[in-house]
Amino acid sequence: GIYESVIWKNNHALGANGFDINYLNPIIFFRPVEYSINSPDNMLIGLNLKYKVNARSFLFSQLVLDEFTLNELKANNGYWANKYGYQIGYKCFDLLSIPNLTIHLEQNYTRPFTYSHWNSANYGHYNEELAHPLGANFIENILILSYRKKRVTTNLKYIQASYGADYVGDTVSYGSNIYNDYNDRSASYGIDMFNGNKTDLKFTQFNLGYILNPTTNLKLEFSLVNRILKSETNESKTLFYSFSIRSDLFNHYYDF
């Protein structure tokens, strides 16, 4: 599938467009329209692909282009406005022909300053990122293993991420925080991945549960979490465990 989106700001300066009727055009690739009307809005285009390997497994991927200059990309000079990202992954059910054993592998990558803008028309909402909790300027690897035997459930999740954060007290934007103005960047060239305060995150979670009521998914569960965060300026380690009784809707997003 191919998709395109636009985020606009209603309170532009006098003479700016705000919402334009052209944005209702259902035809993909209307980016030239944006240029023709001198739009200050934030647009991107993307592609998603899914390939079914067999009845029990599939590959999936996404590509997003925020801004893109082919000549600058070929020059390989770290041009700041080559803003893009990708996701690639694999999921398999009944792994190794073992019933109810599932594996999920995934990698996410986003260049610095992707999803950001020179004004508040970024890809965020209520001070949260719409695309990924790490914002931009990161690479993330995910492994999830889950298994169920009758009423016993287990789940192991491991996440490793590296990203370039901003320095505390520094007004320069290094491309991770999408709420920062990209005009406040440190340079226009030589912007490499993990630009800024390089930070490494390791997150491990193990869950063991017993389903009391399959209809409502009411279960007893034990959870153990280990989180290690290391940067150029800070290091923190967190280990905690919990016991719970709950009937839940699954939340798979703990990678922040």
Where are these regions (language model features)?
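Exposed, low-structure sequence patches enriched in small/polar residues
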Residues: G1-F256
